[in-house]
Amino acid sequence: MPSDNTFVRVRQQQRDPLHVNSPVSGGNISGVQGSGSRSGSTVPPSPPTPTTQPSVNHYDVQVDRLNNLTLEELLDSPDIKGYNRSMQVYNWDRSINKRVRVEFEAKLKSRMSNQVSRWKGNWKEKGDEAKPKWIDPDVWKGLVQFWQDPKSEKKSNNSRNARYHDLDGKDIYKHRSGQTSYKARARKRCEKTGETTPDFLELLDETHRKADGTFIDGKSKEIYKQVTSRIEEEESHMCSMDNPESTGSGGLSVHSKNKIFTEKLAAAEACIQSQAERINSFDILFDYLAEKDPALAAILRHGSSTQIGQANPNEPPVSAAPEPQVANEETAAAALANLATGSSPPSTVF
């Protein structure tokens, strides 16, 4: 009759089947058989020992298979298709978390570029039907309220005018910052260099200068020259040991440089705003003159088209001598235009 040790051994084998063919189990069996022979009892022969098969780690095979898939293949795999796709929730093995994040961020950057602008355009055409399915209704409601706000619409129009209009003849104002705001770029620069305050002039150089060293627009080039000239002027009149604004190397501190940059930038923005206001005043005056004197408005309009037509400076102006009455009207129009723009009257009649 089997002893209690045999029962314990069988239970242990059921719990841990990997140790069936272990040397310890074999020793126990032989020990039991030996004791049965000595006691005179007959012990049934043990079943043939199965051949030990090499263990296969299916976990590693699964990980290798997933690592060889692209993001699209991973999301379209049969394992993922079994989940509820309407919930937009995906699962993957923890061992590929880093790769999934890299793939996700790359896809996000390509898909989300100008995405909000496209949403707004679709909303203007289709209304709330343009809402993407995955956007929270409260978030979409907030976007619609922002798009309908007159202040945000005015800000959008001003930004569009600033991008596509050349008010001072120095080319359209551009930048190379992309979708990254200047504030975020300044924060990243501080994290990279360890500075507490970023150098605004270096940020301007980073976001407005091409790889060949040239600026992308004339306005940025002018501001950069004015700021650097002012900094050199201040540094040439200071002593590094006596002036607290200087650094140990004899130059201005970052705070002082940023102060100069802010002053020059504020002056440039004020100049642009003043030009915009003058242009607006001229438009109002022109509308008033067009209503009161259509003939004078036609003369002004003809003069503007003539100036635009003479785009080539090498071509001599071809115009007939104006009659005295027409000349007087043109002189009056020029005086009114100078009054609106705040400039001095020209010496010759246009």
Curated annotation (Swiss-Prot):
Identification of the protein by name: Probable transposase-like protein At4g04430
Comp. bias regions, Low complexity: 30-43
Family: Belongs to the transposase 24 family.
Segments for region (Disordered): 1-57, 307-328
Coiled-coil annotated spans: none
